Design a protein with these regions (language model features):
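Interaction-mediating elements
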Residues: 1-124
C-alpha cells in the first residue's frame, strides 16, 4: 500500500540540506517522472531526493521553513528523517562556526546511542 507523509521540519538552508542528503546516500534530482506515484506533489517541491530504491524525500519551502513530503514506509520515514535532521544540524553548526570565524570545531564524537557530541572552542 502506498503512503505519503508530510511533516514540518526546521530546515532553512538549502545548501546544507543538499550536503546532508548526499551524506546519507540520497541523490538530488530535478523532478520525478510524471508516471511516478505522487509526482504532482513531489514536483512542486524545491528539493527532491531519491534513495537507492527510488523512494522520495522532497522539501517544499514555505515561509522560510521546509515541508517534508515522502513516500518512504512509516518506519523507514521516521528513521531517515531523524538521521537527516541530525546530519543537517551537525553540518549547519560546522558551517555557522566557520562563517563566524571566532570558533573552531575541536572534536566530534558519535556516542553508542547515536548522539553526536561536538566540542567547539574559541580562540582568543
Amino acid at each position: 500500500m502506498s503512503h505519503l507523509s508530510k511533516v514540518q521540519v526546521a530546515i532553512r538552508d538549502i545548501d546544507v540540506l543538499g550536503e546532508a542528503l548526499k551524506a546519507l546516500g540520497l541523490r538530488r534530482v530535478g523532478q520525478v517522472d510524471e508516471n511516478y506515484e505522487f509526482a504532482d506533489t513531489f514536483n512542486q517541491c524545491d528539493v527532491i531526493a531519491v534513495n537507492a530504491v527510488n523512494r522520495v524525500m522532497a522539501f517544499r519551502f514555505v515561509d522560510g521553513e521546509a515541508e517534508l513530503h515522502s513516500n518512504l514506509e512509516p518506519g523507514d520515514f521516521e528513521k531517515t528523517r531523524d538521521e537527516l535532521l541530525q546530519k543537517y544540524a551537525v553540518l549547519l553548526l560546522k558551517k555557522t562556526v566557520e562563517q563566524e570565524g571566532k570558533f573552531q570545531v575541536q572534536e566530534q564524537e558519535t556516542l553508542p546511542d547515536g548522539t553526536v557530541r561536538i566540542k567547539v572552542g574559541r580562540w582568543v
